Amino acid sequence: MEEIQRYLHLERSEQQDFLYPLIFQEYIYTFAHDRGFSRSIWSENRGYENKSSLLIVKRLINRMDQENHFLISPNDSNQNPFWACNKNFYSQILSEGFAFSVEIPFSRRLISCLEKKIVKFQNLRSIHSTFPFLEDNFSHLNFVLDILIPHPVHVEILVQTLRYWVKDASSLHFLRFFLNEYCNWNSVITPTKASSSFSKRNQRLFLFLYNSHVCEYESIFVFLRNQSSYLRSTSSGVLLERIYFYGKIKRLVNVFVKLKDFQANLWLVKEPYLHSIRYQRKSILASKGTSLFMNKWKCYLVTFWQSHFSLWFHPRRISINQLSNYSLDFLGYHSSVRMNPSVVRSQILENAFRINNAIKKFDTLVPIIPLVASLAKAKFCNVLGHPISKPVWADLSDSNILDRFGRICRNLSHYHSGSSKKKSLYRIKYILRLSCARTLARKHKSTVRTFLKRLGSVFLEEFLMSEENVLFLTFPKASSTFRRVYRSRIWYLDILSINDLANYKYKL
């Protein structure tokens, strides 16, 4: 336990960040509003315009400076109708400003990484950098732990977690008071309607709180994973002899320390290494070990959540699957490890043999049905996948309509460039192109056939050109080579966020 504390002590920031005075500064709320940290929270309260936002902040700060705190009880709000109407709005402004302030210590860590000029740091920030890692490692593994990160989390646990990172007691007391007195919940993420609506209005703050909770979990888990060779199972009587075996190994190290091949043979007594991936509210642990080894880690994680976070973590939230029968849906891809059969013909003198080999291959596919459902929700097609016009864009200019449809089509092609089967994207491109044609035909009050006959299909292809065509036009002499390259999987490491249309399933 002391070793874990030393590890966390080195990992966390030791700077004294006094953030509480920033909450009373007007420019903090201006930054939170202008830099896009809030999604037009001012427009939700129609009684105020953007030009009056500074006046609202001054009013809020004056209430905070008063002896009677502005976070009053519901009984007081009944006596003051004006405050009852604007209570949610003031809390929303305050949460955005507080979220902006409390992110400052974490932003310093990012700046320090940039100043150190870490090699390929920008590439590591890409969400697509996960897939090359999966291609290199998952095909050689046997079992996988599928973990659903537990929630809800008590407010006090979140405040205690932030205490290790933010060395400002006043800010933490203010956050505790804000969460307990205003919303009066026992948890940040709860199924009640009141808490869910509150978290939607204050999305930036609660995303930060949830991510800090997950960061605490990952910090300790990384330490446990790196020290996994010292986590020995002693519960089974069959394995008790291993304790004496490790003691013998320690004595043998002093004797054979000069032998070169001794260190190479130590892997026989070490636990298999764990590969971990987290995406949103799920976490995956994969290993080449046995089912007994994975069950041991399952017990470790259940005990860890219950002891460190005081959370009842049901073992059913962790499932053990064999990797050959496991599929993974995340970041807009359906990934799995499948067997790729191959036949090798071998001939020795007059005898010929055929050897059937099955090679594991990490496969990534685009789930068409959920993607079509996302297009239907965005009003590009109906639920059956038939393209329809976009009436909201019918008042725009022709070039603007074509530019919007073309940008969506190119972004989807760019995002799903790592798909093993590119032909599945043709249906998506077809829906977008025909939806664009119907939108233009609706604007000009004509049919799609008449519109395309008058302007020609080349007019649409000019704006809805896929990455494949752009690649061939850029390098016309090597079109056959680039065609083979395009058909293979390409992971672009400049993608920092999931595509909106591909984010169809996992939403926090």
Curated annotation (Swiss-Prot):
Write down the PANTHER family for this protein, in alphabetical order: MATURASE K
> Which GO BP terms sit in this record?
mRNA processing; RNA splicing; tRNA processing
> What keywords tag this UniProt record?
Chloroplast, mRNA processing, Plastid, RNA-binding, tRNA processing
Q: Which family does it belong to?
A: Belongs to the intron maturase 2 family. MatK subfamily.
This chain's protein is named: Maturase K
Organism (species):
Verbena rigida
What domain of life is recorded for the organism?
A: Eukaryota
Q: Which GO terms describe its cellular component?
A: chloroplast
Q: Where in the cell is it found?
A: Plastid, Chloroplast
Q: Which GO terms describe its molecular function?
A: RNA binding
User: What is this protein for, i.e. what is its function?
Assistant: Usually encoded in the trnK tRNA gene intron. Probably assists in splicing its own and other chloroplast group II introns.
* Primary location recorded for the protein, binned into one broad class: plastid
